[in-house]
Amino acid sequence: MFLLITYPVFDPVAISLGPIAIRWYALAYIGGIMLGWLYARALLKSEKLWGGPAPISGLQLDDFILWVTIGIILGGRTGYVLFYNLDFFIRHPAEIFEIWKGGMSFHGGFMGCVVAVILFCRKHGLPILSLGDVATAVGPIGLFLGRIANFINSELWGRPADPSLPWAMVFPNGGPLPRHPSQLYEATLEGLVLFTILALMIRAGALKRPGLVLGSFITLYAMARIAGEFFREPDPQLGFLWGGLTMGMLLSAPMIIAGLAIICVAWSRGPRAPVAQTISTPDVSTKADRD
């Protein structure tokens, strides 16, 4: 006989104010945005980290966070529709807009973030790679909170585990089998571990090389996601794909190549040259991070 950990049943509503109900996943988004904004402001205040003035002002950062947030939400929903449940949404197109029912994709959200960063930088004449560094430096905060919300909601649980595994647990909607708490594995790898590695890199001067933090985030996230997928139950509407691979694995594999390519570019360009910061510099090329 093995003693399994009892999954703590949580109320899906985190905060209830009369007719307004805030669910855990929404709270994770709000918390991720606020904590990410605070961390980004702290990074921008230190000229030592950048080797000179930061690439964006505090005032511009507020607008930047808004653009990135919109990109993540639109991209995350679009990615889920296209990658994970296209047949369903073709039959029920109106439900595409019902995001409060759940259904977001990291890979779609990341692509939406990339588009938002590029558009914002082109509009304001700011360096794309350096602002990509800012966005991805804070990314693990939101990833950690999002995975914790997945655990609280008893969703995206893991594959069946050996009953002798001390932390195996039975999820309310996961059947009678003990399972890996894969949400906590991913929260640790994609959140805590990734944040720690990037923070140590930043402390060692990574922000002085535009794109180095961005490329490292992409590469390390993809590796962490693929590792986590070995313990995570595939989405029921998709199941296992070619050779036992999951959709998460297939979407993450190209990210490793892209991330390594960005790291090579960042390293070959060398440290950024100190520049005088301005509120708006439309005549500056967004393709250069060292001008």
From Swiss-Prot:
Keywords: Cell inner membrane, Cell membrane, Membrane, Transferase, Transmembrane, Transmembrane helix. It is found in: Cell inner membrane. It is a multi-pass membrane protein. One of its GO terms (cellular component) is plasma membrane. It comes from the Bacteria. A 1,2-diacyl-sn-glycero-3-phospho-(1'-sn-glycerol) binds at residue 147. Signal peptide: none annotated. Pfam families: LGT. PROSITE patterns: LGT (PS01311). Its EC number is 2.5.1.145. It is an enzyme of class 2 (transferase). Pathway: Protein modification; lipoprotein biosynthesis (diacylglyceryl transfer). The keyword Nucleotide-binding does not apply. GO terms for biological process: lipoprotein biosynthetic process. The chain crosses the membrane at residues 24-44, 64-84, 99-119, 125-145, 187-207, 211-231, 247-267. GO terms for molecular function: phosphatidylglycerol-prolipoprotein diacylglyceryl transferase activity. PANTHER family: PHOSPHATIDYLGLYCEROL--PROLIPOPROTEIN DIACYLGLYCERYL TRANSFERASE, PROLIPOPROTEIN DIACYLGLYCERYL TRANSFERASE. Catalyzes the transfer of the diacylglyceryl group from phosphatidylglycerol to the sulfhydryl group of the N-terminal cysteine of a prolipoprotein, the first step in the formation of mature lipoproteins. Belongs to the Lgt family. This is Phosphatidylglycerol--prolipoprotein diacylglyceryl transferase. The lineage of its organism: Bacteria, Pseudomonadati, Pseudomonadota, Alphaproteobacteria, Hyphomicrobiales. The gene is lgt.
